Amino acid sequence: MSFNHHTIEELHELLVAKDISAVELTKATLEDIKAREEAVGSFITIAEEAALKQAAALDAKGIDPDNVMSGIPLAVKDNISTKGILTTAASKMLYNYEPIFDATAVANAYDKDMIIIGKTNMDEFAMGGSTETSYFKKTKNAWDRSRVPGGSSGGSATAVASGQVRLSLGSDTGGSIRQPAAFNGVVGLKPTYGAVSRYGLIAFGSSLDQIGPFAPTVRENAQLLTVIAGSDRKDSTSAPVQIADYTSKIGQDIKGMKIALPKEYLGEGIDPKIKETVLAAAKHFEKLGAIIEEVSLPHSKYGVAVYYIIASSEASSNLQRFDGIRYGFRAADAKSLEDIYVKTRSQGFGDEVKRRIMLGTFSLSSGYYDAYFKKAGQVRTLIIQDFEKVFADYDLILGPTAPTAAFELDTLNHDPVAMYLADLLTIPVNLAGLPAISIPAGFADGLPVGLQLIGPKYSEEVIYQAAAAFEATTDYHKQQPMIFGGDS
């Protein structure tokens, strides 16, 4: 029996009433995963033995009636450390790496008695926008298996969209939660920088990375964020902010809420069908009582260039630790220490990772630092100031999540610049450290279209309020792909 159509609260009621046990729910989830895995390829590791053991222990202890997450399975992106469970970052470099500690986000999930069911596929070291750079497999879109799921958290998005799991965790450095959420018609949120601990997240861009939740609905997404968020002494970038319940404003009306619509987000490079969907969503918000006005974010057009200098520079530094000495892959044919370094990194990293390491090393090198990295930091400040000016007068910003719907497999993975431009609407949010959500807002040629809502720092509750108001008066989130059991 499958329980993938039940909300978290419905599952909780069944568990508390003992209509099902945690073991039965875990077994049913494992069956859902296996039944769909060949079609979509969401997972790198299915932690069957560990999950069933954890579920049995929970049944023996008893489900906590006051903890809605008790006994709920959770899929985790494979760059988030899980003690005793392979954590590969989808790279040959870490093909055999089992961490000896849990990421704080995972530890928080365990504290709420959630069941870690497996590790999801991703772009290698989170570098990509299509989940095609993984060393292990290419994940496929839940709605059309000839198309990409987005990236880099593609596996976490398809796992939810295809009905394998109800909840999953991803990470977002330049759009890696929101873009795959949009491509697969699910809800994905990138929290404020510092709202969720990065301890245990395999670093890509340290000033940009954030762990965040995927779910089929806004409320369930907020419930999962409530579990993983919070201040953490183990993370020096963790913010001293504690929100007790991110669902607190869900259900409140949005009359009088001021929402900005940047003209740059509907300009050059945006598919006309995406633009049409977003403008229709804006009108829907007006019907709900919100005030929609056009604004300008003039420096957002530089976001992609700024991002790829800063993110690649940080990656070139972060990835120096992978050298074949301490853990992970080591080249077998090396004859000296230098040979180990060179051959291990040449053979262990994929092409996209090596491309970004080289770009970052160049940007940080003597003679080019001021021209590239320093200049990128200055323009980043201008992007931040643009957002601050808008948020002085508006509660939220509305726009498309991605400039197109999901593109076909093997079309952009050989064109790095085109792939990078797919993130042009999500990147500025990371550069400014802001929270943003992608919610289902319609379809273009049968493929899901995501609507992005951006807020000032620590405004996740308001973002959820607006997103839930839209969701409650539309049915896009209820439409499911055939693999889930839907009509499309």
Swiss-Prot record:
Keywords from the named record: ATP-binding, Ligase, Nucleotide-binding, Protein biosynthesis
A GO BP annotation: translation
GO molecular function: ATP binding; glutaminyl-tRNA synthase (glutamine-hydrolyzing) activity
PROSITE patterns reported in the protein's UniProt record: AMIDASES
One Gene Ontology cellular component annotation held by this UniProt entry: glutamyl-tRNA(Gln) amidotransferase complex
The keyword ATP-binding appears for this protein: yes
Top-level EC class as recorded in UniProt: ligase
SUPFAM superfamilies noted in UniProt: Amidase signature (AS) enzymes
Active site: 77 (charge relay system), 152 (charge relay system), 176 (acyl-ester intermediate)
Catalyses which reaction(s): L-glutamyl-tRNA(Gln) + L-glutamine + ATP + H2O = L-glutaminyl-tRNA(Gln) + L-glutamate + ADP + phosphate + H(+)
Coiled-coil regions, chain positions: none
InterPro entries: Amidase (IPR000120), Amidase_CS (IPR020556), Amidase_dom (IPR023631), AS_sf (IPR036928), GatA (IPR004412)
EC number: 6.3.5.7
Disulphide bridges, residue numbers: none
UniProt function note: Allows the formation of correctly charged Gln-tRNA(Gln) through the transamidation of misacylated Glu-tRNA(Gln) in organisms which lack glutaminyl-tRNA synthetase. The reaction takes place in the presence of glutamine and ATP through an activated gamma-phospho-Glu-tRNA(Gln).
Subunit structure, interactors included: Heterotrimer of A, B and C subunits.
Sequence similarity: Belongs to the amidase family. GatA subfamily.
Name the UniProt record assigns to this protein: Glutamyl-tRNA(Gln) amidotransferase subunit A
Native organism: Streptococcus equi subsp. zooepidemicus (strain MGCS10565)
